[in-house]
Amino acid sequence: MTESNEVLFGIASHFALEGAVTGIEPYGDGHINTTYLVTTDGPRYILQQMNTSIFPDTVNLMRNVELVTSTLKAQGKETLDIVPTTSGATWAEIDGGAWRVYKFIEHTVSYNLVPNPDVFREAGSAFGDFQNFLSEFDASQLTETIAHFHDTPHRFEDFKPALAADKLGRAAACQPEIDFYLSHADQYAVVMDGLRDGSIPLRVTHNDTKLNNILMDATTGKARAIIDLDTIMPGSMLFDFGD
Protein backbone atom coordinates (compact mmCIF):
# COMPACT_ATOMS: atom_id res chain seq x y z
CA MET A 1 0.00 0.00 0.00
CA THR A 2 1.47 3.35 -1.04
CA GLU A 3 1.53 6.34 1.28
CA SER A 4 -1.14 8.10 -0.79
CA ASN A 5 -3.39 5.06 -0.46
CA GLU A 6 -2.76 4.99 3.26
CA VAL A 7 -3.91 8.60 3.45
CA LEU A 8 -7.01 7.84 1.37
CA PHE A 9 -7.88 4.79 3.44
CA GLY A 10 -7.57 6.96 6.53
CA ILE A 11 -9.86 9.59 5.05
CA ALA A 12 -12.43 6.96 4.08
CA SER A 13 -12.47 5.72 7.67
CA HIS A 14 -14.11 9.00 8.71
CA PHE A 15 -17.30 8.01 6.84
CA ALA A 16 -20.03 5.52 7.72
CA LEU A 17 -19.30 3.05 4.93
CA GLU A 18 -20.89 -0.39 4.79
CA GLY A 19 -18.19 -3.00 4.42
CA ALA A 20 -14.43 -2.99 4.71
CA VAL A 21 -12.54 -0.85 2.20
CA THR A 22 -10.55 -2.98 -0.24
CA GLY A 23 -9.40 -0.38 -2.76
CA ILE A 24 -9.41 3.32 -3.65
CA GLU A 25 -8.49 4.60 -7.11
CA PRO A 26 -8.87 7.82 -9.11
CA TYR A 27 -12.18 8.04 -10.92
CA GLY A 28 -13.61 10.10 -13.78
CA ASP A 29 -12.25 13.06 -15.68
CA GLY A 30 -13.64 16.00 -13.71
CA HIS A 31 -11.53 19.15 -13.48
CA ILE A 32 -12.89 20.77 -10.32
CA ASN A 33 -13.00 18.22 -7.51
CA THR A 34 -10.64 15.29 -6.98
CA THR A 35 -12.66 12.09 -7.21
CA TYR A 36 -11.97 8.49 -6.17
CA LEU A 37 -13.87 5.23 -6.46
CA VAL A 38 -13.94 3.36 -3.17
CA THR A 39 -14.39 -0.40 -3.36
CA THR A 40 -15.46 -2.35 -0.29
CA ASP A 41 -16.53 -5.93 0.32
CA GLY A 42 -20.03 -4.47 0.09
CA PRO A 43 -21.22 -1.38 -1.81
CA ARG A 44 -19.03 0.99 -3.81
CA TYR A 45 -18.71 4.69 -3.08
CA ILE A 46 -17.49 7.98 -4.55
CA LEU A 47 -15.00 9.83 -2.34
CA GLN A 48 -14.36 13.46 -3.28
CA GLN A 49 -12.06 16.20 -2.12
CA MET A 50 -13.99 19.39 -2.82
CA ASN A 51 -12.22 22.31 -4.46
CA THR A 52 -12.37 25.01 -1.81
CA SER A 53 -10.64 27.51 -4.08
CA ILE A 54 -13.71 27.54 -6.32
CA PHE A 55 -16.22 26.67 -3.59
CA PRO A 56 -14.91 28.19 -0.34
CA ASP A 57 -18.30 28.00 1.42
CA THR A 58 -18.36 24.24 1.97
CA VAL A 59 -20.96 24.42 4.73
CA ASN A 60 -23.61 26.07 2.55
CA LEU A 61 -22.62 24.12 -0.56
CA MET A 62 -23.32 20.85 1.24
CA ARG A 63 -26.45 22.32 2.81
CA ASN A 64 -27.72 23.13 -0.70
CA VAL A 65 -26.96 19.60 -1.89
CA GLU A 66 -28.62 18.04 1.15
CA LEU A 67 -31.78 20.16 0.78
CA VAL A 68 -32.22 19.37 -2.90
CA THR A 69 -31.35 15.67 -2.77
CA SER A 70 -33.64 15.07 0.21
CA THR A 71 -36.48 16.75 -1.69
CA LEU A 72 -35.86 14.59 -4.76
CA LYS A 73 -35.62 11.40 -2.69
CA ALA A 74 -38.90 12.23 -0.91
CA GLN A 75 -40.57 12.13 -4.35
CA GLY A 76 -38.99 8.81 -5.26
CA LYS A 77 -36.48 10.35 -7.65
CA GLU A 78 -33.04 8.76 -7.89
CA THR A 79 -30.33 11.24 -6.97
CA LEU A 80 -26.97 11.55 -5.28
CA ASP A 81 -27.04 9.92 -1.84
CA ILE A 82 -24.76 11.55 0.74
CA VAL A 83 -22.98 9.13 3.07
CA PRO A 84 -22.55 10.79 6.47
CA THR A 85 -19.38 10.88 8.48
CA THR A 86 -19.12 8.63 11.52
CA SER A 87 -20.29 11.63 13.56
CA GLY A 88 -23.32 12.23 11.31
CA ALA A 89 -22.08 15.24 9.30
CA THR A 90 -22.45 15.58 5.53
CA TRP A 91 -18.74 16.25 5.00
CA ALA A 92 -15.45 16.27 6.90
CA GLU A 93 -12.49 18.61 7.11
CA ILE A 94 -9.43 16.37 7.19
CA ASP A 95 -5.87 17.70 7.18
CA GLY A 96 -7.07 20.99 5.70
CA GLY A 97 -9.14 19.37 2.93
CA ALA A 98 -12.92 19.21 2.57
CA TRP A 99 -14.11 15.66 1.89
CA ARG A 100 -17.45 13.96 1.23
CA VAL A 101 -18.76 10.57 0.13
CA TYR A 102 -21.67 9.61 -2.11
CA LYS A 103 -23.06 6.15 -2.75
CA PHE A 104 -21.92 4.95 -6.16
CA ILE A 105 -24.83 4.71 -8.60
CA GLU A 106 -24.31 1.32 -10.21
CA HIS A 107 -25.07 0.23 -13.76
CA THR A 108 -24.95 3.72 -15.25
CA VAL A 109 -22.99 5.51 -17.96
CA SER A 110 -22.38 9.15 -18.84
CA TYR A 111 -21.41 10.72 -22.15
CA ASN A 112 -19.13 13.59 -23.08
CA LEU A 113 -20.50 13.62 -26.64
CA VAL A 114 -23.99 12.77 -27.86
CA PRO A 115 -23.82 9.30 -29.49
CA ASN A 116 -27.34 9.41 -30.94
CA PRO A 117 -30.55 11.49 -30.91
CA ASP A 118 -32.14 9.29 -28.23
CA VAL A 119 -29.47 10.28 -25.70
CA PHE A 120 -29.89 13.94 -26.64
CA ARG A 121 -33.65 13.69 -26.13
CA GLU A 122 -33.23 11.89 -22.82
CA ALA A 123 -30.81 14.56 -21.60
CA GLY A 124 -33.33 17.32 -22.22
CA SER A 125 -36.04 15.29 -20.53
CA ALA A 126 -33.81 14.66 -17.51
CA PHE A 127 -33.17 18.33 -16.83
CA GLY A 128 -36.85 19.08 -17.45
CA ASP A 129 -37.75 16.47 -14.83
CA PHE A 130 -35.20 17.99 -12.46
CA GLN A 131 -36.97 21.35 -12.71
CA ASN A 132 -40.40 19.74 -12.47
CA PHE A 133 -39.66 17.72 -9.35
CA LEU A 134 -38.26 20.82 -7.64
CA SER A 135 -40.92 23.25 -8.87
CA GLU A 136 -42.54 23.54 -5.42
CA PHE A 137 -39.24 23.80 -3.55
CA ASP A 138 -38.61 27.16 -1.89
CA ALA A 139 -35.41 28.16 -3.65
CA SER A 140 -34.87 31.06 -1.24
CA GLN A 141 -33.59 28.41 1.20
CA LEU A 142 -30.53 27.93 -1.01
CA THR A 143 -27.29 29.88 -0.75
CA GLU A 144 -25.55 31.52 -3.70
CA THR A 145 -22.21 29.71 -3.46
CA ILE A 146 -20.67 31.46 -6.50
CA ALA A 147 -21.55 35.14 -6.53
CA HIS A 148 -23.00 36.56 -9.79
CA PHE A 149 -22.64 33.20 -11.54
CA HIS A 150 -25.39 33.90 -14.10
CA ASP A 151 -25.73 37.62 -13.47
CA THR A 152 -25.36 38.86 -17.06
CA PRO A 153 -25.26 42.61 -16.24
CA HIS A 154 -22.48 41.96 -13.72
CA ARG A 155 -20.52 39.92 -16.26
CA PHE A 156 -21.06 42.61 -18.89
CA GLU A 157 -19.54 45.19 -16.54
CA ASP A 158 -16.52 42.89 -16.14
CA PHE A 159 -16.31 42.46 -19.91
CA LYS A 160 -16.10 46.15 -20.80
CA PRO A 161 -12.73 46.94 -19.15
CA ALA A 162 -11.33 43.60 -20.37
CA LEU A 163 -12.32 44.55 -23.92
CA ALA A 164 -10.80 48.00 -23.58
CA ALA A 165 -7.52 46.57 -22.27
CA ASP A 166 -7.36 43.78 -24.91
CA LYS A 167 -4.21 42.54 -23.19
CA LEU A 168 -3.60 39.65 -25.59
CA GLY A 169 -4.56 41.52 -28.75
CA ARG A 170 -7.36 39.13 -29.66
CA ALA A 171 -10.31 41.52 -29.90
CA ALA A 172 -9.86 42.28 -33.61
CA ALA A 173 -10.18 38.60 -34.51
CA CYS A 174 -13.66 38.40 -33.02
CA GLN A 175 -14.97 41.89 -33.73
CA PRO A 176 -18.27 40.71 -35.32
CA GLU A 177 -19.07 38.73 -32.18
CA ILE A 178 -18.13 41.67 -29.96
CA ASP A 179 -20.32 44.02 -32.01
CA PHE A 180 -23.24 41.62 -31.71
CA TYR A 181 -22.72 41.36 -27.96
CA LEU A 182 -22.53 45.13 -27.48
CA SER A 183 -25.59 45.75 -29.66
CA HIS A 184 -27.75 43.68 -27.29
CA ALA A 185 -26.58 45.36 -24.08
CA ASP A 186 -30.07 46.71 -23.37
CA GLN A 187 -31.38 43.13 -22.98
CA TYR A 188 -28.88 41.82 -20.45
CA ALA A 189 -30.78 42.85 -17.34
CA VAL A 190 -34.13 41.32 -18.33
CA VAL A 191 -33.80 38.09 -16.33
CA MET A 192 -32.11 39.60 -13.28
CA ASP A 193 -34.66 42.44 -13.17
CA GLY A 194 -37.44 39.88 -13.46
CA LEU A 195 -36.07 37.92 -10.52
CA ARG A 196 -35.86 41.08 -8.45
CA ASP A 197 -39.39 42.30 -9.19
CA GLY A 198 -40.96 38.84 -9.00
CA SER A 199 -42.14 38.65 -12.61
CA ILE A 200 -39.76 35.71 -13.09
CA PRO A 201 -40.13 33.06 -10.34
CA LEU A 202 -37.16 32.11 -8.19
CA ARG A 203 -36.35 28.45 -8.79
CA VAL A 204 -33.71 25.87 -8.07
CA THR A 205 -31.06 26.02 -10.79
CA HIS A 206 -28.42 23.41 -11.55
CA ASN A 207 -26.20 25.88 -13.43
CA ASP A 208 -24.07 23.25 -15.17
CA THR A 209 -26.45 21.37 -17.46
CA LYS A 210 -23.84 19.40 -19.39
CA LEU A 211 -24.54 16.03 -20.95
CA ASN A 212 -21.97 14.32 -18.74
CA ASN A 213 -23.78 15.51 -15.62
CA ILE A 214 -26.53 12.98 -16.32
CA LEU A 215 -26.17 9.32 -15.41
CA MET A 216 -27.98 7.08 -17.91
CA ASP A 217 -29.03 3.51 -17.27
CA ALA A 218 -26.47 1.27 -18.96
CA THR A 219 -29.19 -1.07 -20.29
CA THR A 220 -32.28 1.03 -21.00
CA GLY A 221 -30.54 4.31 -21.85
CA LYS A 222 -32.99 6.19 -19.64
CA ALA A 223 -31.76 9.00 -17.41
CA ARG A 224 -31.27 7.84 -13.83
CA ALA A 225 -29.83 10.82 -11.96
CA ILE A 226 -28.55 14.37 -12.33
CA ILE A 227 -25.11 14.72 -10.74
CA ASP A 228 -22.52 17.44 -10.06
CA LEU A 229 -24.80 19.42 -7.78
CA ASP A 230 -22.17 21.81 -6.42
CA THR A 231 -23.48 24.70 -8.51
CA ILE A 232 -27.07 24.35 -7.30
CA MET A 233 -28.26 27.83 -6.38
CA PRO A 234 -31.38 29.99 -6.45
CA GLY A 235 -32.07 31.61 -9.81
CA SER A 236 -34.22 31.35 -12.93
CA MET A 237 -34.83 28.14 -14.83
CA LEU A 238 -33.85 30.21 -17.87
CA PHE A 239 -30.26 29.84 -16.64
CA ASP A 240 -30.41 26.07 -17.11
CA PHE A 241 -32.20 26.19 -20.46
CA GLY A 242 -29.70 28.80 -21.60
CA ASP A 243 -26.84 26.49 -20.66
Regions found by a protein language model. Name each.
Residues E18, E25-D29, Q48-V59, I105-R121, ...:
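ATP-dependent phospho-/nucleotidyl transfer catalytic cores
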Residues N33-T39:
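ATP phosphate-binding glycine-rich loop
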Residues T39-R44, G221-K222:
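Active-site beta-strand-loop-beta-strand hairpin of nuclease catalytic cores
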Residues E25, Y36, D81-V83:
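Conserved beta-strand elements flanking the ATP-binding pocket of the protein kinase catalytic core
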Residues M216-D243:
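Active-site Asp-x-Gly
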Residues P43-Q141:
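ATP-binding pocket architecture of kinase catalytic cores
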Residues M1-E25:
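Juxta-kinase regulatory segment immediately upstream of eukaryotic protein kinase catalytic domains
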